[in-house]
Amino acid sequence: MENKKVRIFDTTLRDGQQCPGAGMSFEQNLEYTQLAMEVGVDVLEAGFPSASHLDFEIVNTIAKLYGCKENSPIIAGLCQLREEQIDTTIEALLPAVKFKKAMLHVYLPVGIHLMPASLGERADDKQGLIKDVYNFIKKAADAGMEVEYSPEGYSQMGENFDFVTDTIRAAVEAGAYVINCPDTTGGACSFQKNNYFVDDMKKHAAIIAKEYPGRDVIWSVHCHNDFGLATQNSINGVFQGPARQIEGCFNGVGERAGNVSLEQCIMIIKHFAKELDDKNPFYTTINTEKIAKISDYIAKNMLPRQPHFPITGYNATRHSSGGHTNAILRNPLAYQPFDPKEVGKEIGIVFGPLSGGNHARSIIERCGYVCTEEEKAEVAQHIKDLYSQRRKGITDDELIRGYLDYRAPIKIEAFDYSKTAQTSEVKLKGKFFTFKGDVREVHEGKDSALAALKKIIDKYFGPVEVQSHRSKSDTSGITAVSVSKITIADELGAVYEGSGADQDIEISAMKALVDAVNKAYIERNYRKKN
């Protein structure tokens, strides 16, 4: 039975970092290598050793540290078809050779526009180039390298088809194991019919299979995304062509519009390959649950990721619409094509203007509070009204603050107080437990207005003990605001802290006491019992 494993060739450290603004430090290259090993890529292209001393050092260090590990990927280095670059790349990869974990990836421009622009007069000496392909690849193969040959600009080769055929022959004859067929400029499209590069791959694969029977050659695709077709072209290379390796970058980073997104290809193969052949489908050996981790690393350290980016984008598994969230709360796959846990993510439900009562209730109950079927719509509307200017949605913590505001038994619209030598009086306007309107209380003694407020609270709620009271100004000057913290204990000994702020220190303390009592009341009456 044919082995239909599709190798994943990760060029994030090479092609990905060639994108302006995407470069990482030496240490970050090593950190990324560890993540690539955890996710299980088959080949990691660590860089272009001839580009600079630092690039050489990065590739060489990765080859030393990871080439010896049993579960590490093959470590690849890229070079042009130039002997000095071949030698430098071999030297950089030598630490991984004895573990059979070293790949030299060499390319030659063959596109009708690319070839003369890149090679100059050398482009006219096609026979000389074919000889160089053979000689330099043989040199690398004899040094113990696995060799990959890329005819750069393959999808735009046009009239160079026969020349490209000869270079592939020379590469295979010299010992190349992988023939990679790049859509270098991202201009390939299946509408090209007979000029489509996947059809050319099939022709070349047939020629090599006929001329080198029994030779194990892996065909590979390397697609750029300039027309947004990189994923389709890469998958076509596998599903409709001879490709058994996909080259690309996680998050689709890379030159210009980027390389193909590896995570998209991996998940498409996982979910759709069986539609072609359910008995022996194409597959990868990627640990998909680690995909989110490596994707997040790239988004943090290379280039930001679009929120709506497929598979790993921040919004790819988040929902807000009321109808959607209602369905997802019953069945996560109602509005998801796959379980986000497959790639190491969780479904997120963001409460926003279009969210409904079921959504609010699910968050409230998950946070340990009571929300009944009868009141869920009213609770949701209260929270929406409270955050009416937050059209992009609110966090779960903000939603809970809205819920607590809905439950609060004391809501004071206006505080007023007065003091004499022997009394303090407080006047409140608003909601005070079951009473709405004006509340007045006089306290005999030299205590502050806070004592009068506590006297009212003890009547309606039950006695509370003020255990601590701290007030301080947030700034200096006459416009400073007093910030108060008050800790209370109820009859059962439960402790709650409230906070308040006002330019009037007495009112800031009263606000803090109200906040603490509200918390105590809600915990006592609306906290779910285990």
Q: Residue ranges of each PLM-predicted region?
A:
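Non-catalytic terminal/interface segments that mediate subunit docking, oligomerization
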Residues: 18, 23, 29-32, 37, ...
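Alpha/beta enzyme core
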Residues: 6-8, 18-42, 59-65, 83-215, ...
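A mid-to-C-terminal "edge-of-domain" accessory segment
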Residues: 5-6, 10-12, 269, 273-439, ...
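Catalytic alpha/beta core domains of metabolic enzymes, predominantly
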Residues: 185-329, 334
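A glycine-rich helix N-cap at a beta->alpha junction
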Residues: 68-79
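Active-site beta-loop-alpha junctions enriched in small/polar residues
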Residues: 14, 49-51, 78-82, 107-111, ...
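Mixed-charge, glycine-accented linear interaction segment located at domain edges/termini
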Residues: 494-497, 501-529
